Amino acid sequence: MAVSASRVQQAEELLQRPAERQLMRSQLAAAARSINWSYALFWSISDTQPGVLTWTDGFYNGEVKTRKISNSVELTSDQLVMQRSDQLRELYEALLSGEGDRRAAPARPAGSLSPEDLGDTEWYYVVSMTYAFRPGQGLPGRSFASDEHVWLCNAHLAGSKAFPRALLAKSASIQSILCIPVMGGVLELGTTDTVPEAPDLVSRATAAFWEPQCPTYSEEPSSSPSGRANETGEAAADDGTFAFEELDHNNGMDIEAMTAAGGHGQEEELRLREAEALSDDASLEHITKEIEEFYSLCDEMDLQALPLPLEDGWTVDASNFEVPCSSPQPAPPPVDRATANVAADASRAPVYGSRATSFMAWTRSSQQSSCSDDAAPAVVPAIEEPQRLLKKVVAGGGAWESCGGATGAAQEMSATKNHVMSERKRREKLNEMFLVLKSLLPSIHRVNKASILAETIAYLKELQRRVQELESSREPASRPSETTTRLITRPSRGNNESVRKEVCAGSKRKSPELGRDDVERPPVLTMDAGSSNVTVTVSDKDVLLEVQCRWEELLMTRVFDAIKSLHLDVLSVQASAPDGFMGLKIRAQFAGSGAVVPWMISEALRKAIGKR
């Protein structure tokens, strides 16, 4: 949709005079507070980048994390809210000047805000000042191009293309955003509450912009009567006419009244008033001089902004947008001193809509914008450099610190390296402990930490359950009966294979039955180590180990070490220790594809229980 030149010119003229800028801030405050939303921003066409919407002014009405006020000034609640917006704007300007030249940045007052004083919503408000939009891009661009309001609910869930600040909105808990085209620009309102679209809210938010504004007068005089009389007298002398000030007549009447009343008290009061008037004039001149020096210093600073960052490669067709051309104006007629001071202040004031982002390097630009009937397309280059200042501030490095902090930077770098090394050592130690824990588990193949912890918990619960079962079923048992070892020979695959079978003393099995059972049962190997018995039964990959010996300290540790050395995974363990004898029944399984012969298993167990 084509943007008329009258809309752009209206926005530019609105922000040229200080009184109009103050009126704009009051209207933004009224818009945000009328519907009780968190902030209000005004976007307008930049004069340095035609066809680009940039941040112009704003009002913050959200939560405040840290408030800094001067003890010498008492402010009302409304003044505190307005002061917060000014403090956020000053912080943005401090970041802006600190990125370009720290030495040239003016000293900041003690009550100024620092990045650590801001909450999430305040950070969203400040960072929004660095964004720029082409018509049709983002919420402000869409509202500007269509000349209709745009309402967005659940802003934290929106996509980055529709809402480039979605990530910032999520961190700041911004839920609803409303953009309304007003006065040649776009009014953006946001809140942390989810508010459904309602036409009456749009009307209430824009009511302050359409109401007729009357000039407001301050109850406190901005300058002394004598100062105004002097200025008026000088202006009259320049014009060649004579003018009489009512204030002079009033002062004369006051003097006559006090003189007629008589008394030294009235004369003393008169002298005090005259001295105060003179001191007010001197202080006003001093302040004016300081302001002039400050603006002259700003003019000398080599600070010229790059184009603001745009989120994608969207280009502007100049044929759809009309930019007003500046034509030479005739020389203005001579004006009085007061009017000249106001015009000088307006010329020195920063131009809204041309603020530079604080997240890119400063360079000198020799390009000058020109206007013609056939304007060339306004191409805004995308900024490749990341937003370094924001990362620096979030990381804890203020942009306005002194330049002589080389030693502090080196110490900070050393502390960072030490922290990284200590964190690496801690992780290595933790990994070693997990490996030790994994080696104590009977059977686990996954090596991630979550699996190791889960298997450990399950294994401990299983052991606890078995201990309870053993304690409940424990009964006095006599010493195991002595067993005899008999060598039984049987044919196996054409070769004679000798295995040892355990035969209990009280067995009723007959010898013919032994031959038949040997064909069906897996091989069993039993060896006697003094008063100790070891039985090994192997079936495919399953292994049954039975150990009976006298109880000793660290006996089970040696047995499990021997089992581990044979690459066996323990499936279950049953243990009993009646009358000083230990009975172990262990079910295990070969961990790999290979198998170990029974006599090697028995020999390893015999050595384990035979150690003293």
Swiss-Prot record:
bHLH domain: residues covered: 414-463
Keywords, in A-Z order: Activator, DNA-binding, Nucleus, Transcription, Transcription regulation
GO cellular component: nucleus
Residue stretches of biased makeup (Polar residues): 483-497
Biased composition (Basic and acidic residues): 510-521
Keyword 4Fe-4S assigned: no
Highest taxon above the source species: Eukaryota
UniProt GO molecular function: DNA binding; protein dimerization activity
Chain residue ranges for the region called Disordered: 214-235, 470-526
Family, per entry: Belongs to the bHLH protein family.
Function recorded in the entry: Putative transcriptional activator. Controls tissue-specific synthesis of anthocyanin pigments in various parts of the maize plant.
Protein name (Swiss-Prot/TrEMBL): Anthocyanin regulatory R-S protein
Species the sequence originates in: Zea mays
Gene that produces this protein: R-S
